[in-house]
Swiss-Prot record:
InterPro entries: Acyl_CoA_acyltransferase, NMT, NMT_C, NMT_CS, NMT_N. The keyword Transferase applies. It comes from Gibberella zeae (strain ATCC MYA-4620 / CBS 123657 / FGSC 9075 / NRRL 31084 / PH-1) (Wheat head blight fungus). The lineage of its organism: Eukaryota, Fungi, Dikarya, Ascomycota, Pezizomycotina. Residues 45-54 have a biased composition (Basic and acidic residues). This is Glycylpeptide N-tetradecanoyltransferase. Its EC number is 2.3.1.97. Keywords: Acyltransferase, Cytoplasm, Transferase. The active site is at P564 (proton acceptor).
């Protein structure tokens, strides 16, 4: 599952950490003051490069609440668990309650550990001290979006998933061992008036039903301005790769009307998690009709897709979400690069920065018409073995990444489209003078509906997919050389996306993306994507952002997995 995200203004991004701690510490009453620059364009470049604002210098003794804020949001000196626990001692009972209110996941864990639905401030503080600072920060990472919990935390407590507060240096592997004979042969009963169905996505009328459900009731941003608009072509590409099973396309219909009112899907994937290869069900496209959101269908759908996977001997699951659940393997942040800034501005997707004008933004994000890399061309089927080889060698650098067969590589990088069908993915290779494939990159298309916009119906969005380059595979790793090559490749990818009338180019902070996001004028978004493994414990994997939720170019990311 992807997450809808929009760019945030630089000044908003700059103070993001402070806003996350707003229930604990009051913001500095004196507003930041920015010096006026000679030209707005210079002001924007300087602001983007430095990402900071000058504050009036004022010496004062730090309050206990300020210390807690620093322990939570980061400061000049990196906080430790001891710093955080010491700061907790200075919180008032009200502040402890406000802190827990920032994250329902943490609140639920505290309630469970204290055996109380309404633990006292002392009980809550004691429970929090048993958690690591990393767990606390993971819980706060979604920036307030956790109010919309996916399902119930009581449900997740019964499932084989890691819990908050566990040691981060545990042996990796399955949490629960089962046998197929132990799996229920029939699904759980639904509430009266609803029935299970298996959707046949090879039938036009049924994939249209799934499309319409997702188009009206799938993921949207917090302000309900944008919602994913997956076309039937994209849905087939995402849900019908080699090895797909009809039984993994699970629906719920209203018994009387036959209306499809809920859906969940899964595809098989061979996932390398550090040194182990795990066969997983990659769960995606969980959608429930808005009128049924209070019927607690989410846990029921998850249990059913789990049951069907278990019947095939698949015991692990892979999923992503924009909310914090117990317990993320990693957390990445969305970044956005405007291609058609004017349209994005008119849709309310891209803000107009302070002290700027639309024409400056259009000029800032302008791209040339022609690509620059010699030997760059679209992928052909004859290239697939070379691309597979480069993909697997490059992805050895990451901790969690899918392994692909030739058939899977063809499907994901070079899918066949019929007459009138929308193209799902664009893949390009670089062929040198010796006819060797030295680089490749790919991106896929998902449109977003601009809800209630009178001027534009959809935003055409490109999502960075997989890439690889020989520059990153030299005997002596040269990060500077890799950074330059990735910037060259992605710049050409942006030009190609412009050629195909995309409006914005999105990327997460996974893989080596932190090396090119800033230079290619990607702006930080307000969306996070958390990666989860079901029935498999894995120690945390870097997500490409630091504790302040800023790009971590030094450590990069261990996530080498992109889910449409």
């Amino acid at each position: 599952m992807s997450e809808e995200s929009k760019p945030v203004e630089p000044v908003v991004d700059e103070t993001n950490a402070e806003l996350k701690g707003k229930a604990i510490a009051q913001a500095d009453p004196e507003a930041d003051e920015h010096a006026e620059s000679a030209s707005e364009e210079e002001h924007e470049e300087e602001h983007a490069a430095e990402g900071s604002s000058d504050k009036k210098k004022k010496k004062k003794k730090k309050s206990k609440r300020s210390k807690v804020k620093e322990a939570l949001t980061g400061s000049k000196s990196a906080p430790t668990d001891a710093d955080f626990h010491k700061a907790l001692d200075g919180l008032t009972p009200k502040e402890v309650k406000e802190f827990l209110a920032l994250n329902p996941a943490l609140a639920q864990e505290v309630s469970k550990a204290s055996n109380s639905d309404n633990p006292s401030a002392d009980q809550a503080s004691d429970m929090l001290k048993k958690m690591s600072l990393q767990d606390i920060m993971t819980g706060l990472a979604a920036g307030g979006k956790n109010a919309k919990d996916m399902g119930s935390y009581k449900f997740w407590q019964t499932q084989p998933v890691p819990k908050f507060g566990e040691d981060n240096n545990l042996q990796e592997g399955p949490l629960r061992i089962q046998k197929v004979e132990e799996v229920d042969k029939e699904p759980s009963a639904l509430i009266p008036g609803f029935e299970w169905v298996t959707m046949d996505l090879t039938k036009e009328e049924e994939i249209k039903e799934v499309y319409e459900l997702l188009n009206k009731h799938y993921v949207e941003d917090d302000e309900a301005m944008f919602r994913f608009n997956y076309s039937p072509t994209i849905l087939r590409w995402a849900m019908m790769p080699p090895g797909w099973k009809k039984e993994y396309h699970v629906g719920v219909r209203a018994s009387q009307s036959g209306l499809l009112c809920a859906f969940i899907s899964a595809i098989p994937v061979h996932l390398r998690v550090r040194d182990n290869v795990v066969t997983c069900s990659e769960v995606n496209f969980l959608a429930i009709h808005k009128k049924l959101r209070g019927k607690r269908l989410t846990p029921v759908l998850i249990k059913e897709i789990t049951r069907r996977s278990n019947l095939d001997g698949i015991w692990q699951g892979l999923y992503t979400a924009g909310v914090v659940l117990p317990k993320p393997v990693s957390t990445c942040r969305y970044f956005h690069r405007a291609i058609n800034w004017q349209k994005l501005y008119e849709c309310g997707f891209s803000p107009l920065p302070a002290n700027s004008k639309p024409q400056y933004q259009i000029r800032k994000y302008a791209l040339p018409d022609d690509t620059a890399i010699k030997g760059l061309r679209p992928l052909q089927e004859k290239d697939i073995e070379a691309v597979m080889d480069l993909y697997h060698r490059y992805n050895k650098r990451f901790d969690m990444t899918p392994k692909m067969s030739r058939e899977e590589a063809l499907h994901w990088f070079l899918p066949k489209t019929g007459p009138g069908e929308q193209q799902a993915v664009w893949t390009y290779v670089v062929e040198d003078e010796n006819n060797k494939i030295t680089d490749f990159f790919s991106f896929f298309c998902i449109e977003s509906t601009a809800i209630g916009n009178s001027k534009h119906n959809v935003i055409k969005v490109a999502y960075m997919f997989y890439y690889g380059t020989e520059v990153g595979l030299q005997d002596k790793f040269d990060k500077a050389a890799l950074k330059k090559r990735l910037n060259d490749l992605v710049h050409d990818a942006l030009i190609i996306s412009k050629r195909y009338k995309f409006d914005v180019f999105n990327a997460l902070t996974l893989m080596d993306n932190a090396l090119f996001l800033e230079q290619q004028k990607f702006g930080a978004g307000d969306g996070q994507l958390h990666y989860y493994l079901f029935n498999y414990r894995v120690n945390p994997i870097a997500g490409g952002v630091d504790r302040k939720n800023q790009l971590d170019e030094e450590n990069l990311s261990g996530i080498g997995l992109v889910m449409p």
